[in-house]
């Protein structure tokens, strides 16, 4: 025999549970468990989630019956009795009897004592006080709020009673008159009733209609018009204000038998006060039950995405799901994160080998390399809750909010464990606490960081929560956050190489379903975009499509990609701004000087790229001219000393051309070239160790006495002596490069003038026309000596004096 019963919602009063289907037992026990459970016969037709099926043989079934009594100090005291039922196969032979628990069984007696002790105070659990209200605060708040609203509406709908004893539901009109009118009516014995409240006087005439007919002309014009509008009303009450230096004519009113006094208080004062108190209690109960956050960036707004749900893995509410198939060019970083997702999907594969999941993974890389995209891919691939937020959401004006939000975030993640937390731009709250990267003290950020450290690997840490962090400033993070146990892995997301750039271009082209022309080779475009990040390449594809659409093309051609690359490097050509006169000639010779010197360097050094395009059209980036030298066809990770010196000479070729052509009358057009050359020369001397006088040392480390993370000035320990030497060597190197550039320009005067004149006329020179001029460039001996690193031979006087 099988019995199925379904538990219903519990009630506040006492209850009992039963496990039998005998009809006789049901009739006897229905008075105490009818509200608690519903009994079904054999082979039930339906089941519910909380139903239980019990096989019943020839045995006894014991049913507990709870008698509860509430005491204000002790809570609910329970008295238990047991109902013993003999269940057999035949329903007709079943019998039942009710008896108290046997006192002969020692284990049963001790069990009853323990249950009685535990149930005496029903809200005491494990020596911890836990108040469990009988009626939820939500119900109380809703009830009181509804009652308050109803009574408030009734109060508004109840008619006013301006004078005691007047008839209810009669429309009353108040007419304001001067105090002199009131005195006149009192003296003429026309006033029937007066109420005095300080200086406010309300009075009623003995015969309103007669007075209105006879005395209308004596009132003011405004009062007369008002009386005519209220002529049909049953009652008119006049109001006036007594001047402070005039007494109320009580003696005259007594003589005329006028009923007067102060206004009576309306009934219901206690009721109104109670109503207001109930309203505030309802509001308070609602706020306690449903706390309201006045911050727009609270952790309650953190987005939870679950794979497989309606919003599973979505980057935004209406966005599309990102998976690892959409990530290219960062294979190493993707492999690290795929392993974490695989661990969450199939933990037995690693647990049997003794492995544990990493507590945290820190994604480090330049802006645009794809750190957030990788996190979105994890959200799309993981079959666990994924909670994302920004570190800037933790810290606000109020002290303690940051730490509280961190606790709420991890509490939510632990509740849904296993889960993943992604904190973007984590350096906003995780800067080092030693003062090196802090301009001032910020206790709120430090409290937030301390709470984050505790949650990740503290006393109550939870390995079921994995934290992903993203930053492009890993050097400023606190060492306690970067240690193993918190961020076990530091994944560097680097700029993609040529193969990676080509893969990224293919992903974006296929994702946008971009129709490409026959002349488009994504491999050659990848070679043109050395140093581009994933975000740069995505923008490049979009810009190429926009340029093709602007020209009403059906396909995106190679020229569109080339123009998009130029826009990314130098900006957009200005159509309205054009150079004229002497400025146009100077800029043309300046760009021709870059081309001549760059070609001479490429003739000496094998494998160096050559100039492909010259332009003197102003661009939005601020450049008046543009010399395009494409990067090498293969990715380079090292820069040799001769290549570095050759780039220095090329950068100063424009300034050298201006000095030669205009006999020393130079312009400010070379300011960007000088800035870039100075930066390159400083790194060669102070960081790369390419200067013979200073030697192969790191100037910053040497001047500080070793690697020092205290945040002190790098020049503080030698009183600036080393920086003076570095400045002197940088100046000598730049001057030597300029002298060599002057030698190259003087060795090619015809090419400089001819190419400059043609560029001034056409504003843009490229292709075979440009290569015809550059094929005539020769490299002087001074250039060969300089790129070999023997610049001291070119300046013997300066070398000897130094």
From Swiss-Prot:
According to the UniProt entry, which residue ranges have a biased composition of type Acidic residues?
A: 88-102
Q: Where in the cell is it found?
A: Plastid, Chloroplast thylakoid membrane
Q: InterPro entries from the entry?
A: AAA+_ATPase, AAA_lid_3, ATPase_AAA_core, ATPase_AAA_CS, FtsH, P-loop_NTPase, Pept_M41_FtsH_extracell, Peptidase_M41
Per the UniProt entry, the Enzyme Commission number(s) are 3.4.24.-
Q: Where is this region: Disordered?
A: 87-117
Report residues binding ATP: 365-372
Q: Which Gene3D superfamilies match?
A: 1.10.8.60, 3.30.720.210, P-loop containing nucleotide triphosphate hydrolases (3.40.50.300), Peptidase M41 (1.20.58.760)
- Binding note for cofactor: Binds 1 zinc ion per subunit.
Gene Ontology BP term (one): proteolysis
Tell me the membrane topology, using the record's own terms: Multi-pass membrane protein
Q: Per its UniProt entry, what is the enzyme's top EC class, as one word?
A: hydrolase
* Annotated SUPFAM superfamilies: FtsH protease domain-like, P-loop containing nucleoside triphosphate hydrolases
What is an example of a GO molecular function annotated in this UniProt entry? Answer: ATP hydrolysis activity
Q: Keyword check for ATP-binding, yes or no.
A: yes
Instruction: Quote any Pfam family the record assigns.
Output: AAA
Transit peptide residues according to the UniProt entry: 1-55
Q: Where are the transmembrane segments?
A: 134-154, 268-288
Binding, Zn(2+): 590, 594, 673
- Looking at the UniProt record for this protein, which Gene Ontology cellular component terms does it annotate, in alphabetical order? chloroplast; chloroplast envelope; chloroplast thylakoid membrane
Query: Into which family does the record put it?
Result: In the N-terminal section; belongs to the AAA ATPase family.
Q: What is this protein's record name?
A: ATP-dependent zinc metalloprotease FTSH 7, chloroplastic
Give the organism, scientific name.
Arabidopsis thaliana
Q: What lineage does the source organism belong to?
A: Eukaryota, Viridiplantae, Streptophyta, Embryophyta, Tracheophyta
């Amino acid at each position: 025999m099988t019995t199925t019963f379904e538990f219903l919602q519990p009630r506040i009063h006492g209850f009992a549970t039963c496990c039998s289907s005998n009809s006789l037992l049901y009739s006897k026990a229905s008075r105490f468990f009818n509200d608690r459970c519903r009994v079904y016969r054999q082979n039930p037709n339906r089941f519910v989630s909380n139903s239980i099926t019990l096989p019943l043989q020839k045995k006894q079934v014991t049913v507990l019956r709870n008698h509860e009594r509430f005491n204000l100090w002790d809570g609910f005291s329970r008295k238990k009795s047991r109902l013993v039922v003999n269940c057999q196969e035949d329903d007709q032979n079943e019998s039942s009897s009710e008896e108290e628990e046997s006192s002969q069984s020692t284990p049963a007696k001790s069990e009853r004592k323990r249950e009685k002790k535990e149930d005496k105070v029903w809200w005491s659990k494990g020596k911890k006080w836990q108040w469990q209200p009988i009626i939820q605060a939500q119900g109380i708040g809703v009830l009181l709020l509804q009652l308050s609203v109803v009574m408030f509406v009734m109060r508004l709908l109840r008619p006013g009673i301006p004078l005691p004893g007047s008839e209810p539901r009669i429309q009353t009109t108040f007419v304001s008159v001067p105090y002199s009118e009131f005195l006149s009516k009192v003296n003429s014995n026309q006033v029937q009733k007066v109420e005095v409240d300080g200086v406010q006087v309300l009075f009623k005439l003995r015969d309103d209609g007669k007075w209105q007919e006879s005395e209308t002309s004596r009132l003011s014009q405004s009062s007369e018009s008002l009386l005519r509008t209220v002529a049909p009303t049953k009652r008119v009450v006049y109001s006036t204000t007594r001047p402070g230096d005039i007494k109320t004519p009580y003696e005259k009113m007594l003589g005329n038998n006028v009923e007067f006094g102060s206004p009576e208080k309306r009934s219901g004062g206690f009721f109104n006060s109670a109503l207001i108190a109930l309203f505030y209690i309802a509001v308070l109960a609602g706020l306690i039950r449903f706390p309201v956050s006045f911050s727009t960036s609270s952790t309650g707004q953190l987005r939870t995405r679950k794979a497989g749900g309606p919003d599973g893995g979505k980057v935004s509410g209406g966005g599309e799901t990102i998976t690892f198939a959409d990530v290219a060019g960062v294979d190493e970083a993707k492999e690290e994160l795929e392993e974490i997702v695989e661990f969450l999907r199939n933990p037995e594969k690693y647990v049997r080998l003794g492995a544990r999941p990493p507590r945290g993974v820190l994604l480090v890389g330049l802006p645009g390399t794809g750190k957030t995209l990788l996190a979105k891919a994890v959200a799309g691939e993981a079959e666990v809750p994924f909670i994302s937020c920004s570190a800037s959401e933790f810290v606000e004006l109020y002290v303690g909010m940051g730490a509280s939000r961190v606790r709420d975030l991890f509490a939510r993640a632990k509740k849904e464990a296993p889960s993943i937390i992604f904190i973007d731009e984590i350096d906003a709250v995780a800067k080092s606490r030693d003062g090196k990267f802090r301009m001032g003290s910020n206790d709120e950020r430090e409290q937030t960081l301390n709470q984050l450290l505790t949650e990740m690997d503290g006393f109550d840490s939870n390995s079921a929560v994995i934290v992903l962090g993203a930053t492009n400033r890993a050097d400023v993070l606190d060492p306690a956050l970067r240690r193993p146990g918190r961020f076990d892995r530091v994944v560097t997301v680097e700029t993609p190489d040529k193969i990676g750039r080509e893969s990224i271009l293919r992903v974006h082209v296929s994702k946008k379903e971009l129709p490409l022309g026959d002349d488009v080779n994504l491999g050659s475009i990848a070679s043109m975009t050395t140093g581009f990040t994933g975000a740069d390449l995505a923008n490049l594809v979009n810009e190429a499509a926009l340029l093709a659409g602007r020209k009403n093309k059906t396909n995106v051609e190679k020229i569109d990609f080339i123009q998009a690359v130029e826009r990314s490097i130098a900006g957009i050509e200005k159509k309205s701004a054009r150079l004229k006169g002497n400025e146009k000639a100077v800029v043309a010779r300046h760009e021709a000087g870059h081309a001549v010197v760059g070609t001479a360097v490429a003739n000496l050094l094998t494998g160096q790229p050559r100039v492909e395009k010259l332009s003197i059209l102003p661009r939005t980036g601020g450049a008046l001219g543009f010399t395009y030298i494409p990067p090498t066809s293969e990715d380079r990770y090292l820069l040799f000393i001769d290549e570095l010196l050759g780039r220095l000479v090329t950068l100063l070729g424009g300034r050298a051309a201006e000095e030669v052509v205009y006999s020393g009358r130079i312009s400010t057009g070379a300011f960007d070239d000088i800035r870039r050359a100075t930066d390159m020369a400083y790194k060669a001397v102070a960081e790369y160790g390419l200067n013979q006088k200073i030697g192969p040392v790191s100037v910053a480390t040497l001047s500080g006495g070793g690697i020092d993370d205290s945040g002190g000035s790098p020049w503080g320990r030698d009183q600036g002596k080393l920086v003076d030497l570095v400045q002197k060597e940088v100046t000598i190197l730049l001057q030597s490069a300029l002298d060599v550039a002057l030698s190259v320009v003087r060795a090619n005067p015809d090419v400089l003038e001819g190419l400059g004149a043609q560029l001034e006329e056409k504003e843009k020179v490229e292709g075979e026309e440009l290569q015809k001029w550059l094929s005539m460039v020769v490299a002087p001996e001074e250039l060969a000596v300089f790129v070999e690193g023997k610049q001291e031979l070119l300046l013997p006087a300066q070398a000897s004096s130094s």
